[in-house]
Amino acid sequence: MIDSLDLVIDTIVAREVLDSRGNPTVEAEVLLEAGAIGRAIVPSGASTGAHEAHELRDGDSRYLGKGVTKAVNHIEDRIAPALCGISSLDQASVDGTMQELDGSDNKSSLGANAILAVSMATARAAANGLGLPLYRYLGGPMASLLPVPLMNVINGGAHAANNLDFQEFMLVPHGASSFRESLRMGAEVFHTLKGLLSAQGLSTAVGDEGGFAPNLANNDAAGDLLIQAIEKAGYSPGKDISLALDVASTEFYQDGCYAFGGGRYTSTEMVNELEKLVDRYPIISIEDGLAEDDWQGWALLTKKLGKRIQLIGDDIFVTSTKRLQQGIDQNVANSILIKVNQIGSLTETLQAIDLAGRSGYTSVISHRSGETEDTTIADLAVATRAGQIKTGSLSRSERVAKYNQLLRIEDELGSQAVYAGATGQGPRGRS
């Protein structure tokens, strides 16, 4: 029998490690009294919302200013003394203690990267101390829903050095009967797409998230290529595999207009452009179709398309219950993107997912463009029964690590495993 004292935090250490872009990030290890260890590494974004929690960087000559030794030192000098002696099972107390110690509204004192690393490592240590997988520890005995992956196979915008305005063009294999099958379907289309690009003399180099980053004539050309790849791989667009977009429109929002494709569009015109895309392609989900503070534009987008497709708020919500509640009150979007480092603690992440579910919004668990081998978000997707995950393409090990963890979870669950696409709990195709 496990003694509760065995699960008390004994030691916390931190170090500066590298993410998938070669930039420093924070790793934390939490050691419990009985010897269980939890380790976590935080990710970092490229296109970041203005309202995200503060990522603390050193700003000196090391790593061109991107070092994180300040955050590492905060963990070992300030956070560790405050948390040692607290039960790892009391996640809310652990996270609350760090927030109180920080004292700011956006975690700018200690750094959200410092707080989150310890928060996630604590949960991992508690799970290990109890002998449970992380998804079971966080989600309880009913955690058995495997998410539909939104696979970013063509990268643009801030994620690639090409001429595509929109940031992500994704495959959504909702027609699969299992997560394993969805992964196979996505991989087959991914490799078929590579062949199509090569045949046209286009680049098959990949961007930050493992998708291809070719120079194409326009955003429509990307959609056309994906339809061709889906069909050539033997699948039916809209039935087996649909499309999703991350427009990341904040990135090209200038002086009240959306500047892309050689034109400038008002919010109303931008909504009309997105509606045309939904009419033309089997798109079932659009993320950040409008900019992070264009609340009126978002309301119009939701009124026009909210009953037809999933409208995900990323930059506008930043995994914040306060901003999500504002969106709920104003009928903005119908889904929230969940990025643990946007809000900076596991407790607040779970609160955002809970609020979304109670309000009829879907949640999409997401990686960042600067990722690591950490697989926490895979377990989080299953634990929270979110039904959807965004973790990149079918290449680059930091992306595939999450897919492989979901395969392990599906195997471990056996007959209990349920694929969200097979039950209609993920995004679904349009007839």
From Swiss-Prot:
Which InterPro entries does this one have? Enolase, Enolase-like_C_sf, Enolase-like_N, Enolase_C, Enolase_CS, Enolase_N
| Compartments where located | Cytoplasm; Secreted; Cell surface
List, alphabetically, the PROSITE patterns matched.
ENOLASE
Entry binding sites for Mg(2+): 246, 287, 314
Active-site residues, Swiss-Prot/TrEMBL: 209, 339
**UniProt binding sites for (2R)-2-phosphoglycerate:** 167, 339, 368-369, 390
Identify one Gene Ontology CC term for this UniProt entry. Answer: extracellular region
EC number in record: 4.2.1.11
Co-factor(s): Mg(2+)
In terms of SMART domains, this protein maps to: Enolase_C, Enolase_N
Catalytic reaction(s) noted: (2R)-2-phosphoglycerate = phosphoenolpyruvate + H2O
Q: Predominant location of this chain?
A: cytoplasm
UniProt GO MF annotations: magnesium ion binding; phosphopyruvate hydratase activity
Q: In which pathway does it act?
A: Carbohydrate degradation; glycolysis; pyruvate from D-glyceraldehyde 3-phosphate: step 4/5
The Gene Ontology biological process annotation of the record reads: glycolytic process
Q: How is the cofactor bound?
A: Binds a second Mg(2+) ion via substrate during catalysis.
This protein's record includes keyword Transcription regulation? no
Per UniProt, the keywords (alphabetical) are: Cytoplasm, Glycolysis, Lyase, Magnesium, Metal-binding, Secreted
Q: What is this protein's function?
A: Catalyzes the reversible conversion of 2-phosphoglycerate (2-PG) into phosphoenolpyruvate (PEP). It is essential for the degradation of carbohydrates via glycolysis.
The record's annotation in HAMAP family points to: Enolase (MF_00318)
Q: Which family is it part of?
A: Belongs to the enolase family.
- In its UniProt entry, what is this protein called? Enolase
Q: Which organism is it from?
A: Prochlorococcus marinus (strain MIT 9313)
Gene name for this UniProt entry? eno
